[in-house]
């Protein structure tokens, strides 16, 4: 019997494998979703460093949100990561959803980043 933990790990490996095949030399927009917050960062895998990051724990954003764990918070993080990416000169990324299903907060963050000007 396959456990749910194994299923999640398989899904994450499958997504990362597809990203490696498709991405070329593009940067990666990676997200992490906890029960109370959501985090996003743009990573350069060739250099092994994070260029830009945003989360619901950022000072200005935290004050303006009533909760860090809803779609509105994810949308705000998506807008913020896109704005910071533009300042850093990043326009094209590959969306790395990890093991998370493209639904709810993950989808809201992705759509906000697209609206903010990121292409993926």
Swiss-Prot record:
Sorted UniProt keywords: Ribonucleoprotein, Ribosomal protein, RNA-binding, rRNA-binding
Disulfide bonds: none
Pfam families: Ribosomal_L18p
Presence of the UniProt keyword Cytoplasm in the record: no
GO cellular component: cytosolic large ribosomal subunit
GO annotation (BP), single: translation
Gene Ontology MF term list: 5S rRNA binding; structural constituent of ribosome
Domain of life: Bacteria
Oligomeric and partner information: Part of the 50S ribosomal subunit; part of the 5S rRNA/L5/L18/L25 subcomplex. Contacts the 5S and 23S rRNAs.
Matching PANTHER family: 39S RIBOSOMAL PROTEIN L18, MITOCHONDRIAL, LARGE RIBOSOMAL SUBUNIT PROTEIN UL18M
Family: Belongs to the universal ribosomal protein uL18 family.
Stated role: This is one of the proteins that bind and probably mediate the attachment of the 5S RNA into the large ribosomal subunit, where it forms part of the central protuberance.
Protein name (record): Large ribosomal subunit protein uL18
Originating organism: Bartonella henselae (strain ATCC 49882 / DSM 28221 / CCUG 30454 / Houston 1) (Rochalimaea henselae)
């Amino acid at each position: 019997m396959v456990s749910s933990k194994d299923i999640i790990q398989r899904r994450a490996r499958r997504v990362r494998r597809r990203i490696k095949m498709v991405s070329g030399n593009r940067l990666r927009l990676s997200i992490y979703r906890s029960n109370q917050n959501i985090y996003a960062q743009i990573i350069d895998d060739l250099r092994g460093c994070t260029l830009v990051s945003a989360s619901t724990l950022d000072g200005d954003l935290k004050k303006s949100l009533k909760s860090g764990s809803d779609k509105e918070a994810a949308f705000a993080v998506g807008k913020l990561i896109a704005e910071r990416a533009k300042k850093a000169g990043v326009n094209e990324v590959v969306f790395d959803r990890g093991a998370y299903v493209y639904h709810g907060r993950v989808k809201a963050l992705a759509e906000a980043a697209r609206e903010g000007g990121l292409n993926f």
